[in-house]
Regions:
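SAM-dependent Rossmann-like transferase core, predominantly class I methyltransferases
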Residues: 44, 54-141, 145-157, 283
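S-adenosylmethionine
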Residues: 139-144, 148-286
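N-terminal auxiliary segments of SAM/dcSAM-dependent transferases
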Residues: 1-73
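Alpha-helical elements of Rossmann-like donor-binding domains used by nucleotide-donor carbohydrate transfer enzymes
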Residues: 7, 27, 55-58, 98, ...
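Short, low-complexity, intrinsically disordered N-terminal peptides in bacterial proteins
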Residues: 1-10, 109-118, 287
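Residue-level signal for pocket-adjacent positions within structured domains
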Residues: 35, 43, 67-68, 73, ...
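Short, solvent-exposed loop/helix junctions and linker helices
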Residues: 2, 15, 49-53, 90-93, ...
């Protein structure tokens, strides 16, 4: 197969905007075939071995069908680390990195190693690939982190990621809508639950609809806050007094979510925007 960088990205322009198509091809050539940016722009792709050229052709066929490049490569970069992903688990987004950064910046305080404080107990509801739980475990060493998800497939991937990255996270199979009260309490509960309304499907890219798990993305139009309500209600007993709850949210419902949290007795509710200026995150505290 003789091809050029230009020929490769043109195969994807019916699915992606031009710049995104170029970025996807660069990602493949760098990650899978070890080409540098200079190699790509000087069309060293034309010098691939017959075996590598065959592998590239198969990759391009998958990409041309709309399969996300993260699934094709089997990994995604999140907070500077490589997380394994596969069909059946949501691909982590850059916005969620900002959620992790907020938690870490607020709660990771210096301490004397000879007299460490009691570890913070953290729960991630809706673990997916484990990106939030693993990041918090690694970036906030004085923590005991648990995470739950309803998907056995996602938990297998999350556990593999934790082992490979050296994170101690207790993963459990649980339904976020049916979290039962226990004697265990947490200092932090964090969640990026499904929050896209069914009616918003028409605004989504087709390859997301075709390939990513809908149960990790969508909520019914008549109850868009169902996950926030369930987790917040659980937090009224599962959070320690003064413990904090962090959500990634649909920007359409920032006011409604804040009002719901206040009605449940939470205090100090704060909303933050993402890199696009959308109201994307909420932090609140159990009084």
């Amino acid at each position: 197969m003789y091809t050029t960088y230009q020929n490769l990205y043109k195969q994807l322009t019916n699915i992606y905007p031009l710049n995104e198509a170029k970025a996807i091809v660069r990602m493949v050539l760098e990650d899978r075939f070890g080409l540098t940016l200079a190699d790509i722009y000087t069309d060293k792709v034309t010098q691939l071995s017959a075996d590598d050229a065959s592998k590239l052709e198969k990759i391009m066929l998958r990409l041309a069908k709309g399969e996300p490049v993260q699934y094709v490569l089997g990994s995604v970069t999140f907070c500077g680390r490589q997380f394994g992903v596969a069909p059946g688990v949501l691909i982590p987004r850059p916005e969620t990195e900002l959620l992790c950064e907020w938690v870490v910046n607020v709660l990771d305080k210096p301490y004397c190693a000879l007299q460490p404080p009691t570890p913070l107990r953290v729960l991630d509801v809706g673990a997916g690939s484990g990106c939030i739980a693993i990041t918090l475990s690694l970036d906030m060493p004085n923590t005991v982190v648990s995470a739950c998800d309803i998907s056995p497939e996602a938990l297998l991937i999350a556990r593999d990621n934790a082992i490979r990255l050296g994170a101690a996270v207790n993963f459990q199979l649980k339904d976020a809508l049916q979290l039962a009260a226990t004697e265990e309490t947490f200092d932090i509960i964090v969640s990026n639950p499904p929050y896209i309304c069914d009616s918003e499907r028409t605004e989504m890219m087709q390859n997301v609809l075709d390939h990513e798990p809908p149960t990790a993305l969508f909520v019914p139009d008549d109850d868009p806050l169902r996950f926030y309500r369930a987790i917040a209600e659980y937090g009224t007993t599962a959070l320690s007094h003064g413990g904090e709850l962090y959500f990634e949210i649909n920007d359409r419902f920032a006011d409604e979510i804040s009002a719901m949290l206040n009605a449940l007795g939470y205090a100090g509710t704060e909303v933050r925007t993402d890199q696009f200026g959308k109201q994307r995150f909420v932090k609140t505290m159990r009084a």
